[in-house]
């Protein structure tokens, strides 16, 4: 969705007469074929770096903008630079991508530089999971679990001791605690997970245009049940400046926040790519 929105916004912008948009995807994506000037079906992202470089050279591309899983392309930055191709992957450097994509490492780095993170425990087996749940239930009124690696909230659950087992089939984000422990114990191999307090406060999403660790523009979308509010000034913007600088963010990215019980904003994650809803703010003219 965001790739189509980026193309549409470019075609509607003042740059439309001076740029040619070439899009590629590992899937057919007919909507991209409609809006882009040219579309190519690319190999799976893990094997696409050489193919993308060849296409950029063939079509005389000046700038390559990558979306999801861009860390596979970031590893080849030097090769693109040698061919005078500007590479936009969401962050500069493989180490920065590794830190952003590992939610535990990301939290540790936020804590180290004094930013408002959400405390968490990393677990790698059933015994560690049960111990972490017991520890965090003693500290916080509500807890949740999410995988160390993942996108789009896949695998996230709020854990409740009294939730009916069938609740998981009605509301996928709520799971009985014992049921989750039992299901996790059946994984082979186990998946690294985080246990952390569940924050039920307001959530916001900051859409950011940045260049080599410096913010060029940002706007916050505060999420309500049936609508979103766009703010040109927001308390999270100062935090975003620190995050963008520390992780050397570059391009169009998104940073998620949520309020704790004291209404303080806490960092959820950095998405080194445009959020699915970033086009909701296009009426502001900011991004």
Mark where each language-model region is.
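Active-site "cap" helix and flanking loop/linker of ATP-utilizing ligase/carboxylase catalytic domains
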Residues: 235-261, 272-287
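Phosphate-binding site of ATP-dependent enzymes
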Residues: 169-243, 247, 258-266
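Active-site nucleotide/adenylate-binding loops and adjacent lid/helix of ATP-dependent enzymes
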Residues: 97-192, 212
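Residue-level detector of structured alpha->beta connecting loops
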Residues: 60, 84, 114, 140-141, ...
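ATP-binding N-terminal substructure of ATP-dependent carboxylate-amine bond-forming enzymes
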Residues: 1-93
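Glycine-rich phosphate/pyrophosphate-binding beta-alpha loops
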Residues: 153, 222-229, 271-284
């Amino acid at each position: 969705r965001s790739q189509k929105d980026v193309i549409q916004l470019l075609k509607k912008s003042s740059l439309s007469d001076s740029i040619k948009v070439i899009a590629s995807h590992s899937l057919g994506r007919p909507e991209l074929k409609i809006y882009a000037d040219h579309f190519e079906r690319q190999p799976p992202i893990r094997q696409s770096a050489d193919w993308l470089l060849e296409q950029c050279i063939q079509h005389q591309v000046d700038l390559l903008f990558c979306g999801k899983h861009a860390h596979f392309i970031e590893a080849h930055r030097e090769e693109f630079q040698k061919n005078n191709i500007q590479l936009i992957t969401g962050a500069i450097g493989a180490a920065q991508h590794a830190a952003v994509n590992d939610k535990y490492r990301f939290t540790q780095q936020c804590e180290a530089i004094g930013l408002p993170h959400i405390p968490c425990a990393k677990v790698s087996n059933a015994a560690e999971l049960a111990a972490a749940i017991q520890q965090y239930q003693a500290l916080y009124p509500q807890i949740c679990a999410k995988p160390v690696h993942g996108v789009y909230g896949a695998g996230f659950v709020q854990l409740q001791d009294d939730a009916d087992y069938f609740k998981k089939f009605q509301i996928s984000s709520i799971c009985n605690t014992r049921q989750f422990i039992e299901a996790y114990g059946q994984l082979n191999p186990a998946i690294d997970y985080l246990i952390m307090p569940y924050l039920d406060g307001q959530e916001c999403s900051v859409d950011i245009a940045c260049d080599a660790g410096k913010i060029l523009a940002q706007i916050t979308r505060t999420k309500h049940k049936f609508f979103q509010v766009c703010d040109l000034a927001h308390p999270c913007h100062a935090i975003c400046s620190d995050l963008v600088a520390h992780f050397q963010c570059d391009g169009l990215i998104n940073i998620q926040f949520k309020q704790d019980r004291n209404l303080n904003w806490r960092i959820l994650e950095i998405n080194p790519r445009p959020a699915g809803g970033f086009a909701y703010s296009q009426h502001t003219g900011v991004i």
